[in-house]
């Protein structure tokens, strides 16, 4: 059993999925055949090659072209658009004393999490 967890465990391993349950966003990583999940309920954004492609605020933006219900936010749409970029190998992780977190992948994805 683990007595502590380290984000460095994710280095060299792949981000395989992104999803949500209500406003909790989950990031799934494959670490030697085991799934590790990072859960966030704070401000974040995802950039691809420097362009913002996903953010927490997208959860609350409903698409007008879809009926109300499940998977009708811009977040859900944008996650589906990101799917072809996954899996993405993690090449760097930075965490500040203020709990800012940045995860970068080899294909240009950059996840930036900010504390609230």
Indicate residue ranges for each PLM-predicted region:
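Surface-exposed, interaction-prone regions used to assemble/regulate multi-protein complexes
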Residues: 1-116
